Amino acid sequence: MTEVEERINAWNDGFEELLSYIPAKLYYREHTANQWKQKKSTLEEKKERRKMKFSLDGLVNDADDDSQKSSKWEQSSTMSDDTDVSDRHAESMSQIRGKLASKIQDLREKRKAGDLNQKRQNKRPVENEKDSQKGSGKSKVQKKKHKASPRAGF
């Protein structure tokens, strides 16, 4: 067993020597050191983020953030015509928002008008059913109760 242990130790020493030639920055990540120092978000911060997610003001702020992020990216990638591109991006976003708001409003108006028409149409057949039931003298529920089932004898 001593020979085996000596061989293993020799291999281990050789392997450790090879590893010593590799700089540590190649196999250790820098951001892992900060990973454990990061604070967890508090309950209030989570609530604020959730509110911003569903509020219209949050959409405006997100669009501003997106335009700032995109403009930073454009500045780093290309230095020419960066103001024209960011202006077009901001204009297109505002136009899209305007179109979306108008479509939503149109759909709401159509829905209100459609609901009124449906309510009117739904009331008419109900009145007709009542008239037909009055003439027969028995309601549909009473007719079903008196009907014998085919398995009544079993």
From Swiss-Prot:
GO CC annotations on file: nucleolus; nucleus
Localisation per UniProt entry: Nucleus, Nucleolus
Modified residue annotations for Phosphoserine: 80
Positions of region (Disordered): 36-154
Any one GO biological process: ribosomal large subunit biogenesis
Basic and acidic residues compositional bias, start-end: 105-133
Gene Ontology terms, MF aspect: DNA binding; RNA binding
Record function comment: Involved in ribosome biogenesis and cell polarity. Required for the synthesis of both 40S and 60S ribosomal subunits and may also play some direct role in correct positioning of the mitotic spindle during mitosis.
Record protein name field: Ribosomal RNA-processing protein 14-N
Source taxonomy: Eukaryota, Fungi, Dikarya, Ascomycota, Taphrinomycotina
